[in-house]
């Protein structure tokens, strides 16, 4: 970044913002880059601001029992805030004084007041000086207040982030990631732009008092008629606002439902295509969209009338102020025009400035209170460890994740019992729990000596991870003692990769040791992977390591833990994503040899690992089932395998239910606090559905559980969670993106958090931060790929993983709205900022406007209709003004009249009443025409939005994966959330406002041109100057806004990344380093935002300067060229003031329209995406004249002989696959054939291309070559017909929000009897029957009430229903409990006995059932043989299979031993002094 010219700028340059000219010039000529942005001054750095506020907040905490954050903010920013407030007030006062001088100028033209004619020129100079002073006061004041707001936001951003890193895990379990993002985005952004309005809470009343005093001088008591009307108007607008909020609240649930389905579709787009569900998903989403649009139209109409009321209230304000006085005493034209000018200022103060200021204070204080509550939450406390001990001891330890479960329910019962009058659907109250206070660990005892290996085993949900968390201090024991050294290293179950290089991820801030580093790389089998990268271990890994395979991420995470020298290593299932051979080698070389002298606790379920362990601890439902050696285990616990694997009395479903349903229901209905909230608020927070969908949804909270752990639900009054919650005051459609995506360039949108299914949907779905930390990094990342496909790994679908801490058991899409890495290096930031924005120009093109107008034919006619009505309004205005300027004037001739009454007066005799009759008639006509002329426009623009949404949805569903792979899920979802919200809500009203303002300006210019042609001549160059200035500024401002939006994403990405790796961060003590990274991300955003604010103020000030010059010209032209007659001068000067203020507004509105039209550009870009599918060759009918057999794939009534595929024979010839057109080949020249009914196993190391091959079979990639099924080539039939030949069970199970029936049969092709029959076959009937409604039970949030095994069975049922002859299975047993795995094996043998099965699997026992094996190495087929031949040769399969398995297969063979591995000596321990910086 460059040094800012602001540092050396003069006072004049700072006052007029001239120091921004270099960046404006550069932005106009070329595209701006990050390197062009100026560095921020030190006073704006996050380090300084956060330190300042943190110091004051600590002081507040120390000095008071009830600390207030607002006091800390006041001590930091109050005096500067008030300083600029005074300047703002003085600027507003000049607006009130201007009409006085205008009145004097008009009065000087009265024929009876010729002595003042000589001073008219001086009055004109004074009026112009007032405009100059106002400009010089207002703009620096507004900029200063924006600057203070920015500093407050930065300081609180930092404070919140630092607090987040200190929060206890129990607190994190109760806070959703959506709440945190809302806290940082929704609430804090109120300070950025709202602070300038805050002063109007006291300025506006003073302004009104001053104006009413001045108007009283003119009109006496009748002045209050106009004020009364304005107050009534403000109340009317408030009523309309409440009505609009009611419609928006109703609409919120519909938008939520649509975005839930849309987000699930986007995250699982590969599965949608594999199942051929494109049409079903499109129909489902469009049905929800129809309901949503009905409410959208109602809200838009109300908002339209609200906006129109302000535009057309001016007639009545002036009319009601003037009419009573005129009827009683008569009135002079000077008073009319002066009153008009006063009323313009008064209307703005009463109906806009004061309500906005009150709302700003309300929102800001609410935000401060939420942040204050958050900052006072319980912090993580490191346990007091004995640093001299060498052993690890637990004595009678018991722990709860939920602190005081029993107390929580007792409190809930008490609160509900106190509300005996409540009934109905208000909330849910739980009773009859046998789960009260269930500990996650109970009475745990063990002791291991230094250098020993403890293997911790147990079924899913037994408490293995909780045990490690307790040792780390994340989970505090409620009873018992823990003793060990504080030098801990930790490897999480789900690998966490921070943005940075591979080397940085492994070293992780520990001092670099070349020998140690190389030894760890070798032991973790990373040498070969690193050698494939051009940059070796210096390759920059993006967000979450998305360019790496799951196995590569797991090995890097393990290497990080091993590299740190510690006394105790905690390894939580580190081998979950590794193939059998790699796992075996790493366990031997790394865990057993490299770390031989270290104390290790390994969570595992592998028998080979238990045999090698010094001690074994088996957990069952939180209790210690066994502790001892392996030999003791065999003697004392012969049934240990059932407890270990979960095949006996352990209920997999109930364990998951304990951790997901109970906690989720607690979160959903927030039974922690006391404050009652309305049902609508509860509905917003709980993501509850409405209508028929919602009625079913009520039942979905229940869970089929075994009889021991049932609970009942009673309807009671709701409770609300204390502390932070989602901003229920913010209408949903204004929250439609968690974080603006990197393309966003809106100049007018408040930067608030809005739904995007990443954290936005999470905000609605109450995804806890603890769940975020314990969830698979693979989730949702299949679409999150960069363009460089060479290092990309695709699986058939990303994996879904569950742990005992998976509190909500919901799919997680945190990446969808957070697209940019927080890496700080500027060059790396360019990499991370990649998005599809390059093809969207900085300024919206005319082609986009033309295309938008022609989307709906009616829009052109509506625009013509608006123009016709406008011409009628101009004609009516001319009539009124002609009457005012040319009314016959009479002199009452009474010498006793006051001086005011000696002026020319509009006499109120009967002969002159016609003036007011005509005025009222014209005003009513204009009001009626103005009110209704925009309705057809708003209605038609919403229809255009509906059409564009439909086209975009269709395009995304039909787009090839090669195109979707280059897009980020967040970018796609933002099109459907934020951009569609803009098209629905903001764009129609903004276009209406712009057209309205433009027509007002044109009409006023037309009137002035008739009255004074000289002024028209002066107007033309001014308008030209405005247009040129707008074009000049727009080029730079949109680019700066773009960069600012991009700079915002790393902030939120860094927050989510930090939360995902929080346990690792704390274990390694890297919080200060990540705070530094966060501050750098904040500083980067600040540099862009500050520059944008500065250039915006430069533009606004230049507009004001042009206006001042124009007004000076108009004033002197009218004074020098007008002869007698005050009417003409009054009209000209009043209209001149209105023309320029309205023209300024129109120019700003045009910038807003251009910004919003960028959303339209992005939507068009998605609509223009290519569609997938190659042109098919023509197929010839059979000899009997029937249609081609490939056309009757779905027809169950056709004779079996004609159904395709009939056998499942598959021939692959020279198959080559690529992720993108023209990219590197990821599979090359694959050729083999499969006989009907044969089972083929895919073998290969992690990342070799096994899952990619399955994707290629489904034509999800760019492919070359040919595949035939039963003699039919894939080129001869459509894509849909080809994919329907396959049944698919992907890695990541796709369960969308809907009923069981919809999930199994979305096209509604099968009867209930057939569905139940299949459910019986796959073992799902007993599960489905336990739910209310059975097949009609609504699954939500990725099927959170189902275990992972049940979800896999759902996929199996889909394949059985599809009658597919070829079944593709991609890691079906990954993270499955053995019960579900055995059901899948049995179903495969029975239901798919005659089908061709292609299996990609890591479990040896599953692979042994295959007849043929396809071995893939380096993207090519190395072997394709039977199991006998592979065992005879030195193959991967032979190395992977254990001798015992070989004996089981072929007892008559002697299993040969594997090649000995190179010895790796254990690392010597480092001294105490060398590891001080890594200690907790």
UniProtKB/Swiss-Prot annotation:
Pfam families: ABC_membrane (PF00664), ABC_tran (PF00005), CFTR_R (PF14396). One of its GO terms (cellular component) is membrane. Residues 1452-1480 are annotated as: Disordered. GO terms for molecular function: 14-3-3 protein binding; ABC-type transporter activity; ATP binding; ATP hydrolysis activity; ATPase-coupled transmembrane transporter activity; bicarbonate transmembrane transporter activity; chloride channel activity; chloride channel inhibitor activity. There is a cross-link at residue 688 (Glycyl lysine isopeptide (Lys-Gly) (interchain with G-Cter in ubiquitin)). The chain crosses the membrane at residues 78-98, 123-146, 196-216, 223-243, 299-319, 340-358, 859-879, 919-939, 991-1011, 1014-1034, 1096-1116, 1131-1151. The modification Phosphoserine is found at residues 549, 660, 670, 686, 700, 712, 737, 753, 768, 790, 795, 813, 1444, 1456. Residues 81-365, 859-1155 form the ABC transmembrane type-1 domain. Residues 654-831 are annotated as: Disordered R region. Residues 423-646, 1210-1443 form the ABC transporter domain. GO terms for biological process: amelogenesis; bicarbonate transport; cellular response to cAMP; cellular response to forskolin; chloride transmembrane transport; cholesterol biosynthetic process; cholesterol transport; establishment of localization in cell. Residues 1386-1480 are annotated as: Interaction with GORASP2. This is Cystic fibrosis transmembrane conductance regulator.
